[in-house]
Regions:
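A cross-kingdom feature marking solvent-exposed beta-strand/loop segments within repeated
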Residues: 2-6, 11-12, 29-43, 62-79, ...
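Amphipathic alpha-helical segments
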Residues: 19-35, 91, 95-98
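Structural preference for beta-strand elements that scaffold enzyme active sites
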Residues: 13, 55-58
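A general secondary-structure boundary signal
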Residues: 13, 21-25, 35-37, 46, ...
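Short, charged/polar surface micro-motifs in flexible loops or helix N-caps
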Residues: 52-56, 63-64, 88
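Vicinal oxygen chelate
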Residues: 1-7, 10-20, 47-50, 57, 69-149
């Protein structure tokens, strides 16, 4: 899905949704160690675990919202794949021009200082896809930028 003005630079994270399943969190924690970042979202708790150059994100439903609706419809498991892009605005413009179905026509703020946008699941055979653009000075999951600040 690369274009002339943008490209996918790697897998940013894989997200797993659950409804407060300690077994899921314990399994991820035993494999990857403690989460580097924990954030409250609207109706969910997000934990980011480092997995080499990528992350595993767990989304725990804590109330009504997108994660709970996903769980009601599909149950626990893979929520989405997130690909890192070098330029999210040209990516969205290019994908829209190609007729790729988008959930977000404009990028919005994401975790860890990123800008994000979601493609409709129909764009990739029923799998929800997120595009992620890292900030100019990427931060690690603990909130420290690469310069050590």
């Amino acid at each position: 899905m690369n274009g002339e003005r943008w490209c996918i630079t790697g897998l940013h994270h894989v997200a797993i949704a659950h409804a407060g399943d300690a077994v899921c969190e314990d399994a991820v924690r035993s494999l990857l160690g403690p989460p580097g970042q924990v954030e409250d979202g609207p109706g969910f708790l997000e934990r980011m675990y480092e997995a080499g150059p990528s992350f595993v994100q767990t989304l725990e439903a804590t109330g009504e919202g997108v994660v709970q609706r996903f769980l009601d419809k599909r149950g626990p498991g893979l929520h989405h794949l997130a690909f890192q892009v070098d330029a999210i605005d040209p990516a969205l413009e290019d994908l829209a021009a190609r007729g790729v179905p988008l959930l977000d026509r404009e990028a919005r703020a994401g975790g860890m200082g990123t800008r994000i946008a979601f493609l409709h699941p129909a764009a990739l055979g029923g799998v929800l896809v997120e595009l992620v653009e890292e900030p100019e000075a990427p931060t690690d999951p603990l909130g420290v930028d690469q310069e050590g600040r």
